[in-house]
Amino acid sequence: FDAMRRDLDAQGNAAALDRHQAQALDIITSPRVRDAFDLSREPAHVLARYGHRLGRYPHQTVKTILYDWDARPFIQARRLVEAGVRVVTLRPGDWDHHSAAEGDIFFALRCLMPLIDRSLTALVSDLRDRGLENDVLVVLLGEFGRTPRIAQPGPGREHWADAGCAIFAGGGLRMGQVIGQTDARAERSRTGHITFQNLLATIYRVLGVDPRAQLTDFNGRPQYLLDDP
């Protein structure tokens, strides 16, 4: 970050940035954001709460398959938010369990589910303890669902666009509710479709952005943030 800022200043490229680019540059090169990556500033009991370690979990039969887990991004996400970063994305673990090539899905989830449960719970609880639960929205989701039936050979699960799930916590939203319902096999929606556009509209509103807003692109044409907010 420091080297990037020096290079931009030395070459004069920073002067050519627009308002949004300059704001982004100021954020990622600020001392507060840089310090957010320094986990040595976190007390030991906080690190332990998240399950602070990089773990490698060998497959029970295919010894070359290892499941990695690192709780540090969860802590860094909270620290980045405290430093003023508006949106943070993290990708914990490896959830690509299609077939035996990626390992037995049952073994993999027995490894990974307790780990993400601990780290995600710690993040949500930590934000609440710091009085940030209404200011920060935590979203856990993938880009699609998974086949309701186990795929063979495998065992594993393939991509499934007809139904999926997401977890929302905080952001001033009402907690403790389940929105939507599938059939008994989790194959199809029974209560009408809740689309990714709808999820993005909720996220935009929490960020203070009108999901119905219309912007003008570089060609002077109007563009909507979402087609179906």
Regions found by a protein language model. Give the residues of each.
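Ligand-binding pockets and gating/stacking loops
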Residues: F1-P229
